[in-house]
Amino acid sequence: MSISTITIDVQTDEKKIPASIHWSATDTGADKKQAAKAMMISFWDAAEKAALRIDLWTQDMMVDEMADFFYQTLMTMADTYGRATQYNDQVDEMKQFARNFYTRFRERQLQENKAQ
């Protein structure tokens, strides 16, 4: 049995707001830490039957980047759920929700840009 290690470094400002996020993992093959503007980590606590989460984003992450991040995360969550369950009908629903979410975001951005 082998052990993989994931390391996450979060630098915060004086108000404890993330200024930078860097991560590394033993199995990636990358020589140096990778920069990220956001992260979502979830752990399942079987005893409590609850998800434990760490959601962080840096102060310089733009709203459009956040929408892209959420869209891609929702799509990959659907793929993961599909691989685990083979419940393709629910996978399709999750992906449709993600597409609708992203479409509504784009429409909102267009409206807000017109108003300016």
Describe these PLM feature segments.
Residues 79-116:
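C-terminal charged interaction modules
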Residues 1-10:
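Structured beta-strand/loop patches that form or line metal/cofactor-binding pockets in enzymes
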Residues 19-86:
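Active-site- and interface-proximal helix/loop "cap" or "latch" segments in soluble metabolic
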Residues 1, 30-33, 110-116:
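Intrinsically disordered, low-complexity linkers and terminal tails enriched in Pro/Gly
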Residues 13:
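Acidic surface patches and DE-rich sequence motifs
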